[in-house]
Amino acid sequence: MKDLFGKLRAVFWVLLLGVMVTPPAAYAYEADGPRFGFNTQAYSRADVDNGGSYSRTDMNFRAGYKWLTIAYTRSDYDWNNAGDARISRGHNPWDTLHKFSVDAAFDGYLSESVDWFAGMTLISGFESQIWDSFSLSPRAGLSFRATPDLKFHLGALGLVAPAHSMLLPLVGFEWRDSRDMGLSAKLGFPATQIQYRFNDMIATRLAARWTRDLYRLSNDSAVSRKGYVEEESVVSGAYIDFTPFDSLKLTVGGELMAWHSLRVYDKHGDKKSKTDMDPSVGAVFRASYSF
């Protein structure tokens, strides 16, 4: 089963190598005024390949104004049979992980058919100590409008982090606007979706996304003292979006975390181990409001 999901992950990378300029959990039509959002999601218990299991609950709060967005995410873990978990030598690996982010996003046009986009995200992921937890993620690229309904994106995304820095190409396309009736699509990396809008208020979506988060572990962590854990996953889901008016958007859905791994690094950023988890299912609720 692990080999199967490893192959599926490789296929996912090949098919979804691209970018969505619009974030996967967008605010209600991204108004220029103040905007606020909340989402919560819970995942069922998943077995760890070297012992133990856990379930996870996430809560995210975010606020923004024009080009600036500030967000906080809290992830709570419920471990079972942690004594069998070799990742932490018989102790609970961690109970809660936190992530703060500040994002600045800009865009403009070069001509009638070419737009530009750029941005920078400052991220702090940690268990209890915020020191040595900061990462920086710049991005930039161009969007080319081939037809009124078809747009292509080309750019690059970087991640400068205490462990496992990376540079990724951004290539993707966008077909029709999500506010249009009927089918629309945004295919790319790190998220992709196909949507069908029934009317101004109701739409359904099939979506998939790749996520990667890095957390600085506590000074006395049983996993890696002053080290880091990198959590990487591929999540797919089916969602219903309800937009009673332009400034409010509500989303409910179910998700499958088909591939999920943890990589542990020491305090110098050197890799110590990798742990895979079995698939798990989850439920999602999101709400966003903009003025």
Language model segments and positions:
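Transmembrane beta-barrel domains of bacterial outer-membrane proteins
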Residues: Y29-S135, K226-S236
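Transmembrane beta-barrel strands of outer-membrane/channel proteins
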Residues: P34-S44, I70-D76, A118-S124, L154-G158, ...
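Sequence/structural signature of outer-membrane beta-barrel proteins
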Residues: Q41-D49, S75-R86, Y109, T121-Q129, ...
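Solvent-exposed loop/turn segments connecting transmembrane beta-strands
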Residues: V48-Y54, W94-T96, F126-F134, G158-L167, ...
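Residue-level signature of outer-membrane beta-barrel architecture
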Residues: F61-Y65, A104-G108, F144, W175, ...
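Repeated loop/turn-to-beta-strand initiation elements of outer-membrane beta-barrel proteins
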Residues: K66-Y72, E112-W116, P148-L154, D180-L183, ...
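Outer-membrane beta-barrel translocator/channel fold
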Residues: S75-N92, G188-T243, K249-D270
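Outer-membrane beta-barrel "beta-signal"
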Residues: L170-R176, I240-D246, D276-F291
